[in-house]
Amino acid sequence: MTRAVHRAGFRPLAFASRHLLLRPAALKIAASIVLTLLALGLYSLSRGSYPLPASTLVRALLAPQEMGEQPRFILFDIRLPRILMALLCGAMLGLAGAAMQSITRNGLADPGLIGVKEGASIVVLALVLFFPAVGLVWRPLAGMVGGIAVALLVLTLARDCSRPRFILIGIGVSWSLAAAVGIFMTTADVRDVQTAMIWLAGSLQAATWPLLAVAFCWALPGAIILFCTARAADVALLGDRTAVGLGVRLQQLTVLRFFAPVLLTSASVSCVGSLGFVGLMAPHMARFVLRGGQVSLLCGSALIGALLVLATDTLGRLAFAPLQIPAGIVIALVGCPFFVVLLWRRRDAL
């Protein structure tokens, strides 16, 4: 068995009494993505309307107490929370997309395409417009309620999450909820609408340390669920009968891996608005560059999702300065053609 594994190009990695089979090439690619994230993050930290030279940036990170008040505020209260929020939300959406595509066995599946984002958005928007005194910590909870409600509605109408019509029904529900969001926007106060429009476009400019902490607290359970059920998900891909014969509890697995992406997506939408197509693109890119099982797919999707959001946010912030284009708009410009190509390639299955 060990010789066969080595001949296949895998290397066993022991961790906490478990063994994962990883390709050395995949490890190198993952390491290169991490280095790219680090380099892009440092570049984003140093660029903006108030540029920070490399020497000043390094000194600020090592000894922040020696900085002036203005550069310290810009670096630690504006740019750093924004970059970390981009990384976190991108990773959350990448994980959500990978899990949704796995459980539905459909490469077109994405929580954003089945109305989860719109469900979370409409509840959070109602909370912001009509109950502005509600604390920030309750927004992800409200978004999660909306996202789960929409997911249950789509699942009930489609009857089976593995059928192609699950995606089509989700798109229809998503458009209906988008119309409801438009009704909210036309009846609310103009000042509130302006703020809501920036948030709905997927802007990270309002990222703060408290908001980042809230997002992390809601993201952690979803990520833990997905990684803990990754091995069972690999077995489930062999077929229902085989999985049951090997001891996989399919019903519990389906419930966990269906609602974990809903939790991750709802938390992301509640904090930074809609970042479309990240959950659709990241898993496909991860499969192409990393390959392997669910653990490899989840890790790759999280890294690539983080890279997509950070890159598009940096581009939208710097390319047209002083005008800042929300990351959600930049991602949509890339994601729409990507979705059309996927739809065309899978047209016979729909």
Regions found by a protein language model. Name each.
Residues 2-350:
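Alpha-helical transmembrane segments in inner-membrane proteins
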